[in-house]
């Protein structure tokens, strides 16, 4: 259940600000 928004393709994935 990830929050909406764009995510980086790095690992671990982090929400982009």
From Swiss-Prot:
InterPro entries named among the record's database cross-references: Frog_antimicrobial_Ranidae (IPR032019)
Tissue: Expressed by the skin granular glands.
Pfam family, one: Antimicrobial23
Lysine amide found at: 17
CC terms in the record's Gene Ontology section: extracellular region
Paired cysteines (S-S): 6-16
UniProt keyword list: Amidation, Amphibian defense peptide, Antibiotic, Antimicrobial, Cytolysis, Disulfide bond, Fungicide, Hemolysis, Secreted
Chief location category: secreted
Membrane-traversing stretches: none
Places the protein is found: Secreted
Any Gene Ontology biological process: defense response to Gram-negative bacterium
Similarity comment: Belongs to the frog skin active peptide (FSAP) family. Brevinin subfamily.
Function: Has antibacterial activity against Gram-positive bacteria B.megaterium Bm11, S.lentus and M.luteus, Gram-negative bacteria Y.pseudotuberculosis YP III and P.syringae pv tabaci, and antifungal activity against C.tropicalis, C.guiller-mondii and P.nicotianae spores. Has hemolytic activity. The mature peptide inserts into the hydrophobic core of the bacterial cell membrane and increases permeability without disrupting membrane integrity. Probably binds to the outer membrane surface before aggregating to form transmembrane pores.
Name the UniProt record assigns to this protein: Ranacyclin-E
Taxon lineage: Eukaryota, Metazoa, Chordata, Craniata, Vertebrata
